[in-house]
């Protein structure tokens, strides 16, 4: 058996973020969607205020923007990807145990 996964971007009109496909012998066996919800401006402001200068610079670079809202979106996008990847690893680990 061959187990793998794919994480691909989702269209913005569907909520953005990522789509996870869990594959067994290249056939989809499951998966999920990991949207980005950065609509809470207060949460974004709290996040920005908690970042140190290095973190702010990093996320502004990742966003290719000088706007804190774009940095927050880049952060949320990275978090959604990490969640998708974590789910994929859990699935892969469960296949190895079977």
Model-derived features: positions:
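Alpha-helical propensity feature that highlights long, continuous alpha-helices across diverse contexts
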Residues: 2-98
């Amino acid at each position: 058996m061959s187990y793998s996964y794919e994480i691909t971007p989702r269209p913005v009109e569907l909520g953005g973020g990522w789509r996870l496909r869990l594959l067994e012998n290249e056939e989809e066996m499951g998966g999920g969607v990991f949207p980005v919800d950065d609509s809470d401006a207060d949460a974004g402001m709290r996040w920005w205020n908690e970042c140190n200068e290095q973190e702010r610079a990093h996320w502004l670079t990742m966003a290719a923007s000088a706007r804190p809202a774009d940095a927050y979106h880049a952060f949320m996008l990275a978090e959604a990807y990490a969640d998708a990847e974590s789910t994929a690893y859990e699935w892969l680990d469960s296949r190895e145990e079977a």
